[in-house]
């Protein structure tokens, strides 16, 4: 499937981005492989990335039928809510231990032997970037992120789920699918695991995803239910990935480009797209490790339901009567302006914009949050391009974005949040103040 113009911005990390990509990476140039110059991976589906999620309220109703029958008051571990994934739908054994069930990021199933637990998750979605290799890496990072959200840094095994579009011709299929699979495999290896099997089918749309499994001891993971009043909320990747990938496609759609061209240049769209692609392909493994070091109380990853959707779900799981209040929104530079210019099409400033392979939202003790952010910035573990000779740049940035206060297990964004314009790599961080200069209280300053 092709268009009249070539896809933009996937030129091997053009514009100074090459150093941030894995060593040896070359973005796909369709013409070099005998494909039409307008070949687009995203043309093989009508939806993008984690934007394919079933709405939360609908999912809640669907999941009710999967709950096992238990006598009232029986302790089944954490209550279920509407989370990122449906995880594993199998019956839970009678073994004792902490248990997470349907609706959470991952399922935790106590095993019958040795006080161990099986932690397992699954995820899949549709292409949202044009480069097959990077799409594979993003898909793998997104699957592993559910484990990382529980502070788990190791994965014993992965399976790959792949559907081949029946609209692809043989040449397209033989070129694109091996690149997607290699990207998935390389990201798995970066995460210290391997892909040992999976399932491949024919489908109208391309789908890629997988299953991640690990057997853990109780101290290997952090249950997502321990937030206390006085904690702060930390986010480990900027928001705006859905806006960036859509804006990139709008470069070739005049009626849509005309709506945003007054607030962003073509070059800035290309940079935002590269930024989003690199962020999505970066593992959340560093954050998972630091969750233990800095005594995290709860966490989730930000994907298809947007930051407010996942914050609300996490709040519902807490043992204590708490509420999450978000004051700051770190957003890829210019994406807030695009969202406004597009008539609030994405709901970015309201926190409902879908993210794909987003960061972790972590509840941390106030006195430890700044050091967590500092160590995120200084660490290069899991950073794309970290293994290159002469690699540049620091680790991942993280932001203190809100507070945990006493409440009724809910989450909200204040009326006029501070928008943190996160610059493209190599630039200087800038902060755009809202009209309410007191939107973020002194104790919630950036780390």
Swiss-Prot record:
CDD domains reported for this sequence: SelD
UniProt cofactor note: Binds 1 Mg(2+) ion per monomer.
One BP annotation, GO: selenocysteine biosynthetic process
Active-site positions on this chain: 50
Residue sites binding Mg(2+) per the record: 105, 146, 301
Known role: Synthesizes selenophosphate from selenide and ATP.
Oligomer status and interactors: Homodimer.
Name of the protein: Selenide, water dikinase 3
Natural source organism: Danio rerio
